[in-house]
C-alpha cells in the first residue's frame, strides 16, 4: 500500500442605516459558529473584499431578501459579486439553497426570483447535502456574511472551488470476505484524522483527493481497508503550497512530518502523522501532469526507494472534481473511480489482497521505474524524521 474556512467575526458594516447586519438564527449558528474554520491569513483580505462588495452591491443583495434564511449558491452570481459587478442577471432566477427544515415555506417555490435547491444539514456529517440533480455535497465549514436573511459565502473563490467539486459519487459497498485478518486501521477514527488533514490543506488553498488504497477502500467497500498500514491522498503539483510544510516545521500544524521524499517538481511525497487522536500515517503525493507533444495525456505520482530508485504510477487524465462520503466526512475523488482503480489494481480490483503481500513498488499495474537519484541527491530528497 503506497506510501481541511475561516471563521471570523465581521464588525457591523455601517455603510447605511439599512445595510448588513447579523441574524441570530439557527441557520447562521449552524453554518458559522459550529462549522467554520478558525484563523488564517486571508481574514484581512476577506474583510476588505466584503466591505467593498457590499458598498457597491447593497441594493442587489437586498433584492434577494426572503422571509426565511437562505444561502446564495448561484455560482454565476457569486462570481459577479466577486468581480464587483452587481447588475441583476437577466432571463433567469437566482439559485439559492434552503434548509429542508423550511420545506413548509412553500411560497418560496412560487417566487420567480429564485431557483430553490433544498439541502440537509446533518449534525453527524461535515457536509451540506443538496437535493439537486445531480446530487451535490460541499463542506459545511465556510464563513458567511448576512444581508437580512440572505447568507453570502464570505470567501467566494473558495466556495466556487467547493461547488466545482460538489458532484456526488457513490461507492460500491461490496462485501469483502476477510477471514481472520487483523484490523490495523479502524475506519471511523482514521477517517476523522484524514478529515482534519483535509481541513488544513484547504486552509492552505489545496484541494486533496483520495488516491491509492484509500480510494480503493472507499469505492469498493465504502470504508477503509482494515489491514492497510496508511492512508493515501494526492494534491495537484500546481496547487501545492509550501506554506503548509513550513507550518508543520514551525509546529503550527496538528500534524508532523515523518518522511519527506523527492522534490516538488519530481516524485514529491510527504508522510504525515497527527499529534493527537488516532495514530495513522497519511501519505500525501503530489500528482503531476504527463505531457506528450504539448498535451496532457496522463497524470502520475512518484515513489522513492531507499536506494534512490524512482517509481512512477501513471493514471488516465485525472478528474478529482467529484465528492464522496467516507463515514460522514466529505472527501474529493475522481469522477471516474472505476477507470483509475482498474488502471492501478487491475480487473480483479474487487478481490481483497492482504497488505502484507502487496509490494508498494511492484504490485501495482501502473508502476514502472523512473530513473534514480544519485547518492548526493539522496541527501536532499530522502529524509526520515524520528520525532
Curated annotation (Swiss-Prot):
Q: How does it sit in the membrane?
A: Single-pass membrane protein
Q: Which of UniProt's keywords are assigned here?
A: Membrane, Transmembrane, Transmembrane helix
Q: Where in the cell is it found?
A: Membrane
Give a yes or no for keyword Isomerase in this entry: no
Its chief place of residence is membrane
Q: Which domain of life is it from?
A: Eukaryota
Question: Can you tell me which residues the record assigns to a coiled coil?
Answer: none
Tell me a GO cellular component.
membrane
Tell me the InterPro entries matching this sequence. FKTN-rel (IPR009644)
| Gene Ontology BP terms | protein glycosylation
Pfam families named in the record:
W02B3_4_N
Q: Where are the bilayer-spanning segments?
A: 5-25
- What does the sequence similarity comment in the record state about its family? Belongs to the LicD transferase family.
For this entry, the protein name equals Uncharacterized protein W02B3.4
Its source organism is Caenorhabditis elegans
Amino acid at each position: 500500500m503506497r506510501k481541511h474556512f475561516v471563521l471570523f467575526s465581521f464588525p457591523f458594516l455601517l455603510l447605511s442605516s439599512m445595510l448588513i447586519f447579523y441574524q441570530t438564527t439557527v441557520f447562521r449558528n449552524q453554518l458559522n459558529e459550529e462549522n467554520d474554520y478558525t484563523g488564517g491569513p486571508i481574514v484581512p483580505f476577506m474583510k476588505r473584499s466584503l466591505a467593498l462588495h457590499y458598498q457597491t452591491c447593497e441594493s442587489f443583495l437586498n433584492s434577494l431578501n426572503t422571509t426565511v434564511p437562505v444561502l446564495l449558491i448561484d455560482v454565476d452570481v457569486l462570481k459577479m459579486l466577486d468581480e464587483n459587478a452587481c447588475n441583476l442577471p437577466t432571463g433567469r432566477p437566482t439559485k439559492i439553497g434552503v434548509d429542508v427544515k423550511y420545506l413548509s415555506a412553500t411560497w418560496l417555490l412560487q417566487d420567480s426570483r429564485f431557483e430553490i435547491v433544498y439541502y440537509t444539514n446533518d449534525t453527524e456529517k461535515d457536509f451540506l447535502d443538496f437535493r439537486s440533480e445531480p446530487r451535490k455535497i460541499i463542506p459545511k465549514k465556510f464563513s458567511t456574511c448576512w444581508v437580512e436573511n440572505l447568507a453570502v459565502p464570505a470567501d467566494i473563490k473558495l466556495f466556487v472551488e467547493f461547488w466545482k467539486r460538489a458532484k456526488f459519487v457513490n461507492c460500491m459497498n461490496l462485501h469483502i470476505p476477510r477471514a481472520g485478518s487483523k484490523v490495523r486501521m479502524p475506519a471511523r477514527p482514521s477517517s476523522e484524522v484524514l478529515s482534519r488533514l483535509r481541513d488544513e490543506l484547504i486552509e492552505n488553498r489545496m484541494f486533496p483527493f483520495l488516491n491509492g488504497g484509500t480510494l480503493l477502500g472507499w469505492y469498493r467497500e465504502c470504508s477503509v481497508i482494515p489491514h492497510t498500514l496508511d492512508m493515501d491522498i494526492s494534491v495537484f503539483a500546481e496547487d501545492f503550497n509550501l506554506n503548509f510544510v513550513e507550518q508543520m516545521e514551525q509546529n503550527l500544524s496538528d500534524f508532523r512530518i515523518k518522511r519527506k521524499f523527492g522534490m516538488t517538481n519530481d516524485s514529491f511525497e510527504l508522510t504525515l502523522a497527527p499529534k493527537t487522536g488516532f495514530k495513522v500515517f497519511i501519505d500525501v503525493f503530489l500528482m503531476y501532469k504527463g505531457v506528450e507533444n504539448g498535451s496532457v495525456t496522463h497524470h502520475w505520482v512518484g515513489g522513492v526507494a531507499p536506494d534512490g530508485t524512482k517509481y512512477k504510477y501513471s493514471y488516465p487524465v485525472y478528474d478529482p472534481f467529484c465528492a464522496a462520503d467516507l463515514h460522514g466526512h466529505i472527501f474529493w475523488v475522481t469522477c471516474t473511480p472505476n477507470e483509475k482503480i482498474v488502471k492501478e489494481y487491475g480487473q480483479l480490483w474487487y478481490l481483497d489482497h492482504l497488505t502484507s503481500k502487496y509490494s508498494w513498488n511492484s504490485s501495482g499495474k501502473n508502476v514502472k521505474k523512473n530513473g534514480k537519484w544519485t547518492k548526493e541527491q539522496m541527501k536532499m530528497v530522502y529524509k526520515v524524521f524520528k520525532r
